[in-house]
Amino acid sequence: MKITVPATSANIGPGFDSVGVAVSKYLTIEVLEPADVWFIEHDLGDIPSDENNLLISTALQVKSDLQPHKLVMASDIPLARGLGSSSSVIVAGIELANQLADLKLSDDDKLDIATKIEGHPDNVAPAIFGNLVVASYVDEHVNSIVTEFPECAFVAFIPSYELKTSESRGVLPSDLSYKDAVAASSIANVAIAALFAGDLVKAGRAIQGDMFHERYRQKLVKEFVTIKELSGQYGAYATYLSGAGPTVMTLTPNDQAEALKTAIDGIGLDGETLILSVDKGGVVVD
């Protein structure tokens, strides 16, 4: 059995903690034979290979008496880069418990569990459903809507450095004025409505008008303004911080993606530029 979970790009500008899209980088978990103790074979650096791994600890939160197995974990989702690496592991852990214990969890069940573990649905929701997901988490209740993302390419600049979510949240204000909250929510409303309508031009303007988090976080990602200005020269719809950063994501027409990637590569930033697409399947079990 193999469990595959996509990477995710959250917030998409003003959709703070509530909007995310699944993209084409993947975590895979291969389930091998039963064992006396949990063991995860991986080449992902200094992460646990036993029940202290987030994958296993999540699965055991769902079902505490699971039969241990030998597993193989592989991932091309960069760690601590704003592409949902931890969320993908949480979703995989829930699916592992679901399969091994035959729990018959619905996708909504999985989302409820994942959101309680993660604290917000913006990454775990698209990792489960695929596509674009808008979700809320209020009073421990999750509400979500899934739709297809308008046709475009995602050009991701992934810096060589990590940025922990805790550090990125640390620069945010504790509150907004009523006036700013109204303005920020109106921008978010237009962004989501335009994405649902398939209008990337209007969506792009609203995405780049975010007032919730990017103005505070962009000082932590020195490449952000440079890439945003460069992308505008190539007809990009919008550039935004993916999740808590530091990945800088640009939405661009498909026929401009390669040219933009080449341009970003050409300015000598320390990182990797990738062209990604929307993953429409979410978590998959083979």
Swiss-Prot record:
<keyword id="KW-0808">Transferase</keyword>
<dbReference type="GO" id="GO:0005524">
    <property type="term" value="F:ATP binding"/>
</dbReference>
<dbReference type="InterPro" id="IPR006203">
    <property type="entry name" value="GHMP_knse_ATP-bd_CS"/>
</dbReference>
<keyword id="KW-0963">Cytoplasm</keyword>
<dbReference type="InterPro" id="IPR036554">
    <property type="entry name" value="GHMP_kinase_C_sf"/>
</dbReference>
<keyword id="KW-0067">ATP-binding</keyword>
<comment type="function">
    <text>Catalyzes the ATP-dependent phosphorylation of L-homoserine to L-homoserine phosphate.</text>
</comment>
<keyword id="KW-0547">Nucleotide-binding</keyword>
<dbReference type="GO" id="GO:0004413">
    <property type="term" value="F:homoserine kinase activity"/>
</dbReference>
<comment type="similarity">
    <text>Belongs to the GHMP kinase family. Homoserine kinase subfamily.</text>
</comment>
<dbReference type="Pfam" id="PF00288">
    <property type="entry name" value="GHMP_kinases_N"/>
</dbReference>
<keyword id="KW-0791">Threonine biosynthesis</keyword>
<dbReference type="GO" id="GO:0005737">
    <property type="term" value="C:cytoplasm"/>
</dbReference>
<dbReference type="InterPro" id="IPR000870">
    <property type="entry name" value="Homoserine_kinase"/>
</dbReference>
<keyword id="KW-0028">Amino-acid biosynthesis</keyword>
<dbReference type="InterPro" id="IPR014721">
    <property type="entry name" value="Ribsml_uS5_D2-typ_fold_subgr"/>
</dbReference>
<dbReference type="InterPro" id="IPR013750">
    <property type="entry name" value="GHMP_kinase_C_dom"/>
</dbReference>
<dbReference type="GO" id="GO:0009088">
    <property type="term" value="P:threonine biosynthetic process"/>
</dbReference>
<dbReference type="InterPro" id="IPR020568">
    <property type="entry name" value="Ribosomal_Su5_D2-typ_SF"/>
</dbReference>
<comment type="pathway">
    <text>Amino-acid biosynthesis; L-threonine biosynthesis; L-threonine from L-aspartate: step 4/5.</text>
</comment>
<protein>
    <recommendedName>
        <fullName>Homoserine kinase</fullName>
        <ecNumber>2.7.1.39</ecNumber>
    </recommendedName>
</protein>
<keyword id="KW-0418">Kinase</keyword>
<dbReference type="InterPro" id="IPR006204">
    <property type="entry name" value="GHMP_kinase_N_dom"/>
</dbReference>
<feature type="binding site">
    <location>
        <begin position="78"/>
        <end position="88"/>
    </location>
    <ligand>
        <name>ATP</name>
    </ligand>
</feature>
<dbReference type="Pfam" id="PF08544">
    <property type="entry name" value="GHMP_kinases_C"/>
</dbReference>
